[in-house]
Amino acid sequence: MIQIFFLGTGAGSPSKKRKLPAFLVRREGLNILLDCGEGTQYTLMNNKLGINSIKIIGITHMHGDHVFGLLGVIASMGLLDRKETLYILGPRDLKDFLYTSFEYSKFNPSFKIEFIDNYNDQNITIATFKTCHTVESQGYLISERDRVKIDEEKLEKEKIKDWRVMRKLKEGKTVEYNGKFLKPEDYLVIKRGLKVAYTGDTIPCQSVIESVKGADLLIHDSTFLNEPSAFTYGHSNVADAAKVALEASVKLLALTHISPRYEDVTEHLKVARRIFPKSILPDDLSYITLK
């Protein structure tokens, strides 16, 4: 199970309804923050989302609405006596930006900060992919590893209830049971891992489409409803995001990075759903659960 909290779904500058980009992804105790607009630490604390429980932060690019909240988050982690290593992914200039800011503000983190290009553990991987914005930018693909599970329905049909048999089958061993040899390949099924993709700011481009294929959730730049100059600014219109979702065969599309010029987003959803019916436009502080 993966939960995604939409902490900030706005763009450029905050509005009454939408804060700046930030998304918290949770999976069984692992907390990942994607982008960190100004005010993210307040949102985390005010909603008891555990600022010090964040293990990994991924920044898509160096525009202020995506990164100006990072210093505050890290400073608060220090004030809250963090001890665990914080892992950060991001553009090449991010490390210099942070440490120069630390130097000028006389802040010395009490915990280790490690800059990484990707992340792997026994349960998930985090990979980056190229996006198409006006500055160096990257998206993030969070992927659960596929898991082997016992076909409980088949065992029940065959009236096999011995947990020792189940354990050995899961270990890949052939088991003798009631005079019959049970082969693991006949009782094991592969549960495909979930995939969450986040583009940050981008125009629709092939590198994004190829990277997010089959994702269970695609969080895609949808800055404008129908702005002819959207591509000039490195952003997507709602229809562009929907077309990417359709071509990439994703399961669910979340429209985000909504320009503050829009108070009513009813038309955004109508446009997106004409192209890709499984589209949503989350409000700040909403969340979804993928299973």
Swiss-Prot record:
Its EC number is 3.1.26.11. GO terms for molecular function: 3'-tRNA processing endoribonuclease activity; zinc ion binding. The active site is at 65 (proton acceptor). InterPro entries: Metallo-B-lactamas, RibonucZ/Hydroxyglut_hydro, RNase_Z/BN. Its cofactor is Zn(2+). Keywords: Endonuclease, Hydrolase, Metal-binding, Nuclease, tRNA processing, Zinc. HAMAP family: RNase_Z_BN (MF_01818). Zinc phosphodiesterase, which displays some tRNA 3'-processing endonuclease activity. Probably involved in tRNA maturation, by removing a 3'-trailer from precursor tRNA. This is Ribonuclease Z. It comes from Saccharolobus islandicus (strain L.S.2.15 / Lassen #1) (Sulfolobus islandicus).
